[in-house]
Amino acid sequence: MQIAEVILHTRHLADQTAFYHRTLGLPLLAETADSCTLQAGTTRLRFQETASEVLYHLAFALPCQTFQAAKAWVRERVPLLALTGSPQVYAPTSPLRAWHKAGEDEIVFPLIQARSFYCGDAAHNILKFIAYEDLRQEAAGAEGAAAVLHVSEVGLPVADVRALAARLQEALGIEPYPVSRPIAEDFAYLGDIFGQLVVVKLGHPWLPTQTVRATVAPVHLTLSGPQAQQLALAPYPYTITVTAS
């Protein structure tokens, strides 16, 4: 599943523009009085100004061979988020079975052969950088924003995870990721190694914290797919446009 465009809201437009463009180095494609559009690998990332405080989970994919270099590069520019919780945490109910230790700044996902690190952006959204062993695109010399492949995850908090997951599966033909995992009551990844919709129960803590909890905020996604369609996920402010690829 390819995420071509992500449109999110923010109450802190100037700060977000500065963070993603100047701090992280994403190319700035367009800027207006009430929005900014950036390029995150192959994904367009747009922030639209709003009067409300909102919170999102967003992930950038990295080639696995650049993970440590990218982590060091980001850490020089913004504090990484440390894991909170018990001294040793194993999440057997998670779709991805994450291993991590409190106080560390990296999570390993053995089931999908991936690892990630996290930071907060200028509006305190949870920003994840993830590298899969099976994504080994050529990245010689790439550093910083140039190493970002695409937006790989967008969070969609809901009251009933299984109900929305079923709607997405039927409408978009996407499956749980990895395919061997059933849909959990509080958390589901839908998609593939290239992109996932993270359907999570309202109030669920976003890793790596135990205190930043999932809330509803407007999301518009453009995906590449076999057939063009529009999907509105009422009663939530989530809309998906699929363009035929």
Regions found by a protein language model. Give the residues of each.
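Glyoxalase I/VOC metalloenzyme domain signal
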Residues: 1-3, 9-29, 40-87, 96-102, ...
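Minor-groove-contacting beta-hairpin "wing" of winged helix-turn-helix DNA-binding domains
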Residues: 35-39
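Short proline/glycine- and acidic-rich turn/helix-capping motifs at secondary-structure junctions
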Residues: 89-91
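Short, small/polar residue-rich loop motifs at catalytic or cofactor-binding pockets
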Residues: 111-114
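Short hydrophobic/aromatic beta-strand element in the GNAT-like acyltransferase core
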Residues: 116-118
